[in-house]
Amino acid sequence: MNSDQVTLVGQVFESYVSEYHKNDILLILKERDEDAHYPVVVNAMTLFETNMEIGEYFNAFPNEVLTIFDNALRRSALTILQSLSQPEGLSMKQNLHARISGLPVCPELVREHIPKTKDVGHFLSVTGTVIRTSLVKILEFERDYMCNKCKHVFVVQADFEQYYTFFRPSSCPSLENCDSSKFTCLSDLSSPTRCRDYQEIKIQEQVQRLSVGSIPRSMQVILEDDLVDSCKSGDDITIYGVVMQRWKPFKQDVRCEVEIVLKANYIQVNNEESAGVNMDEEVRKEFEDFWEHYKSDPFAGRNEILASLCPQVFGMYLVKLAVAMVLAGGIQRTDATGTRVRGESHLLLVGDPGTGKSQFLKYAAKITPRSVLTTGIGSTSAGLTVTAVKDSGEWNLEAGALVLADAGLCCIDEFNSLKEHDRTSIHEAMEQQTISVAKAGLVCKLNTRTTILAATNPKGQYDPRESVSVNIALSSPLLSRFDLILVLLDTKNEDWDRIISSFILENKGYPSKSEKLWSMEKMKSYFCLIRKLQPTLSDEGNQVLLRYYQMQRQSDSRNAARTTIRLLESLIRLAEAHARLMFRDTVTLEDAVTVVSVMESSMQGGALLGGVNALHTSFPENPLQQYQTQCELILEKLELPNLLSEELRRLERLQNWSVDQSQPQAMEAETIPGSLGGDARKESNFRTSTQQEVNCSAHRFSIGGSFGGSPLLGPSSHLGPKGPASGKHSEEHRNSQDGSLDWFDSVATHPIEPKNTAPVSPSPKTSRGAMALKICNNRSQGKEDREAGQRSKLETEPLPAAGETETPLRPGNREGERPRKAATVSEAAVSADEPDSVLTHHVPRKLHKLHKARAQELCRNPTRPPLQPTSPSHPQPTPIQSPERVLETPKRKRQKSHAQAQEPHQESVESLGAPVAKLAKFTFKQKSKLTHSPEDRGPVSPGTSKPVVQSPENPQRRAKRGAALPGKGPEKLASRIRSSAQPQDETRGVSPQPPYKDRPEEKRERAPAKGTVQPELELGNDMGRFFLASERVRKEEVSCSNKSSKVHACTLAKLANFSFTSPSESKSESPPPPQSKNPSEGGPSCVATATALGRKRKTFQLDTSTEKLSLSKTSLFTLPELDDEPLDFDWDEEMRKKP
């Protein structure tokens, strides 16, 4: 550049600075330190618009123009200082530097990759990540020399291109033509102004901006003066500077190594900003309009966002919700003492290979502006945290993955492949969000404010009976730092495999892009926008989170390492994250309930309703109804009735206010391949593998119930704590018959172990005396038939809810018992099925298909007489019931409800005459089994009933004992009454149970009994009259049972005198018929066959007094084997011990 050009550039820049940066210069002049270096940041776009010639000179000669800018800036500062009338407190500063930023966005000036040789000498903007920082050094850039001959003093500048090396001139530069070549260095007399701060950093290309397989390149950056220590390892920075070359001084026979470096003029740190995402008012207005559209049903809008999250993975609704909450993040807080509480949540995905864990990690890394994706196999502690590297004779710190992901996301795949000493190094990084380094004499602390999303495989096959720490071989301190741990079990399931295969093949054959799916850029913009929200906790959300934390602390099966204050902090972070995801600035009750439901579904929760397999979760058809179910379940269990009533009223007002509520639901049902698209729409009602357990445990909040099945995994079970919604329960079962996964749990690869799978009722345990009553009431029809019936019933129909089981008033209930509300009846109905859930066995596939076909045919048959409910509060029965069960309606219920349908078997028997019909109900069946007709019930205790399995009896003995049949009725009645005369305190507090449920087996066994009645009817005479009298007493009792359902103690004492007799005694003795003064005292006559005292009768009753049944939250899906060896015992011996 010639002198004219230099003068032009200097004048234009001086006038520009005086006009646009006068205030900045005044602030600098007010500073007291005159030797410090002060920057003035100049926007290149504005400068070039003022004068285009400056832009041309700047691009052609950047080093010379920058020196001119600095000189012009000093002149401008001096002019401003002299123009002030009162310059008190202002002083002139000599070390002023013009810092250029804001270059025009064009490929010639802005680079995202490391510059190459052709860029040498150009002023560029380069974006990268700092991976290494050196120590700050003192650089002497000028040195004075004196000629030994003429004593001329001259200045020598250090050569940047040769690592700031000083070279003495070959001859004296004096004008006196001195030819001396000997000089003396005056370094001892050099002032501090001849030195400057110097630092070298190393930047690397951003990994997310590279293509797959590309190795990120790096380059050295030179920082001087005020730019020193302006960044640290792990920072994302944009550097404005001149690309230059440098090499070591030449040596003989040594090749010259030239490297490209960037001499920085200005550094802009991008940590706090969302790099590469343009956030303007138009984008914000688009998202505000989106939530305004879903104002009536915000959960439908949230599910649309979740469906766009990793759309190549089908379903997995729970995992997508958890990942979205983790990406949204919480709020970081710092108290008055300086203690910092992290706002980032950590998520661990544990699952079998091929369950989509790595897909979620890759997608999350793509939509997060600052992210690092690594694997545990190739990462050491230095690769994850920080390492000390010796370069050019000095030690430097090089940042690892966690430091590079500061204020971003760090995805670690194969997390269990880390070595043990490497895992411990990230403890501080996960909780304190910093890394303390003391390596090679370098002691410092680096920030790791990152969200960790890790994935791991279980150690071998996942064993639900063991803890998560044992299954994945990770220590408890490390696991406790994860806010959520989701388990993905790839269990055998034909329906799930069919849906997944059709979804994948559809995308392969006919790839299509759904219009409802958000693009990746839109998802990136949304998550960058919501991370700027600062939601605050509401009082309702505080109450729910606090109450849930207290219940976790009080839980018997709590993990002491997990249920600490970290759990409460995790709940707060996740609640704030969900509020951000819903685009709100307040954490409401909806957020708290959703967070509790997700926490319950993870392995970190389970205090309320247990864990769930997050793999088989689908998007709900009605998200608002699903939330209502969650709200009822959780708030009822947390004992917050006031919040529940207020929330239900709010939901009701919301539904009434929304006129177009059906439209968002219809849109949700059409949700894209990511949730319910293609063939998957036909399977929209499919549920998790634990849906069968959900149906039997949703009402009583059993610890063993699968919480995720009912409130989380879809619309298949909308059962609230106060009973199912009327009319919907039956319809949902009918719609989900084909695509339902209800039967999956029954055909799992492992049998059931009662210790881990038996649901525990919240009511007090039933005494053994109450168990004995079940023997008289529920007679088995044969071991083989009973087991087959139980298997078919468990696999072809869900366990009945409140309205599916008849609960008429019965004598035997304690005094003062009255019909309770639907919730109590529901609890009783469910608890009656507890023994059946213990007896789950393997079933052949053919048998399952047969029962499934029968259930489908029954659903299509409109001529079947419906089952009448006992009270208006009970819902309609599920049409999936077998026809035998529907027709087997108790007689008292028919009298109460005036039903028109009659049993065909009863009509055929009653045609033989009244005495014949009465006797037919108390005879031996064909297979010599102890049976009992449902119509004749004795006094039933409120205790929990247990089914009885008796050994078969050979036909000769049955024929031999057949003649003594009538004489045995009163003795059997006496034995039953004696068993009911146990102390009342043993059965107190136990909810009444529904009648015996195995009616399909009784129906099948009843037909052969008609032929066996005839030879025994001839024994009538006096005994026939006795049976007629007993029947009249029973009918009178039935009419009074609706008014009173109690059995007086005096009657129990009288009837307790009866005892069992051997077959020989029963032939010779004829016991007197029981006399009942009051029909309500004696109860209905119960005459049934008796076995010999010498024979042992086996039962599957669990000994509640010796072993307390508990359900482990880790055994909901992989069912261990049932060993019924300790369950067999001599019932007669037990009766003699407790008369």
Swiss-Prot record:
Main location: nucleus
Disordered, as annotated region: 671-693, 707-742, 776-1022, 1060-1087
Skewed-composition ranges (Basic residues): 842-853
Location relative to the cell: Nucleus; Chromosome
Binding site for ATP: G351, D352, P353, G354, T355, G356, K357, S358
Regions of compositional bias (Polar residues) in chain numbering: 942-954
EC number(s) from the headed UniProt entry: 3.6.4.12
GO biological process: DNA damage response; double-strand break repair via homologous recombination; female gamete generation; gamete generation
Assembly with partners or alone: Component of the MCM8-MCM9 complex, which forms a hexamer composed of MCM8 and MCM9. Interacts with the DNA mismatch repair (MMR) complex composed at least of MSH2, MSH3, MSH6, PMS1 and MLH1. Interacts with MLH1; the interaction recruits MLH1 to chromatin. Interacts with MSH2; the interaction recruits MCM9 to chromatin. Interacts with MSH6. Interacts with the MRN complex composed of MRE11, RAD50 and NBN/NBS1; the interaction recruits the MRN complex to DNA damage sites. Interacts with RAD51; the interaction recruits RAD51 to DNA damage sites.
Function comment: Component of the MCM8-MCM9 complex, a complex involved in the repair of double-stranded DNA breaks (DBSs) and DNA interstrand cross-links (ICLs) by homologous recombination (HR). Required for DNA resection by the MRE11-RAD50-NBN/NBS1 (MRN) complex by recruiting the MRN complex to the repair site and by promoting the complex nuclease activity. Probably by regulating the localization of the MRN complex, indirectly regulates the recruitment of downstream effector RAD51 to DNA damage sites including DBSs and ICLs.
Protein name per its UniProtKB record: DNA helicase MCM9
Gene name per UniProt: MCM9
